Amino acid sequence: MAVRWWIIPMLLLVPGSSGAWEVLSLPFSLYNFYECGFKVDIEALDCDLARNVFGQHLAQELLFKSVKEFIESDNPSKPLVLSLHGWSGTGKTFVSSLLVKHLFKEGSQSRFVHFFSPVLHFPRVQNLEQYKVDLKGWIQGNLTACGRSLFVFEEMDKMHPGLIDAIVPFLGTSWVVYGSNYRKAIFLFISNAGGDDINEVALDFWRQRKDREDIRLHHLESAISKAVFSNPKHGFWQSQIINQHLIDVIVPFLPLRPSHVRQCVRTEMVQQGLEPEEVLVNNITDSFVYFPEDEKVFSSTGCKTVASRINYFV
């Protein structure tokens, strides 16, 4: 294949003197424009999800199916838009990192993977209108550079309502927006909101002695939608993304049982080069706080603090 180079404008988001983020135009050289570092290993993604994500049968199934179908399409009808919901520590951020790892050659270091944090990038509500301009410019500039980009919006429950609507033009079915085809992009929204409702459903299944793996999306989707999209403090409050049905799949993450925490502990110990001795693994697992207080069914923090607890016990 011949080597091809393009010089195109790239937009850089930098902090301005007012506290808002400003968009700067920089020259940007692209090698093999149509590839954009997009190197898919779908089998490795499937394997990684199965081996390293615990207690999330539904999330694994929904994510893998939707991503596989999307990347196998030569002409997708719209960008893939996924919204991940569940309590902290249940695996949302970890799963998004696996997607990045197996979709892009350089993983999270790829210039075509973009992460947004409301607390870091959009902290001041008084700058909301400027943030909208900056965010739209950033998305437009980077999608013009590469239609195979991935955008991850973390902590949507902390985003100022109204801000996310700035990206609505890039999420629909249009062939071309602002001169470029954006339908091969992927957008991930991550939120803790809806976690309480997911937990209630999981707890009801446990109390009724129903198999956890029998929990399906239809058991959760309505409750998540109501909790998230009707919350005036959430980033999706009265959003056109919701009104126009631009989210393709809601992905619930279930609360984790002690057995799942134990798996997390073992895996982390092996990654640290430690011997996962049974007594030590059990002691670390037992140190977590579980709820409800009288039944101790689920971990209050999922697997979030596993690494720090191992360091404490070791």
Swiss-Prot record:
Signal sequence extent: 1-19
The UniProt GO MF terms for this protein read:
ATP binding; ATP hydrolysis activity
- At the top level of its lineage, which domain of life is listed? Eukaryota
Where in or outside the cell it occurs: the entry states: Endoplasmic reticulum lumen
Against InterPro entries, the record matches this protein to: P-loop_NTPase, TOR1A_C, Torsin, Torsin_1/2
Q: Where ATP is bound, by residue?
A: 86-93
Any one Gene Ontology biological process term? chaperone cofactor-dependent protein refolding
Record's keyword terms, sorted: ATP-binding, Endoplasmic reticulum, Glycoprotein, Nucleotide-binding, Signal
> One GO cellular component from the entry?
nuclear envelope
> One Pfam family from the UniProt entry?
Torsin
Record's subunit section: Homohexamer.
Similarity-based family:
Belongs to the ClpA/ClpB family. Torsin subfamily.
For this protein, the record's PANTHER family field holds: TORSIN (PTHR10760), TORSIN-2A (PTHR10760:SF4)
Q: What name has this protein been given in UniProt?
A: Torsin-2A
Q: Which gene encodes it?
A: tor2a
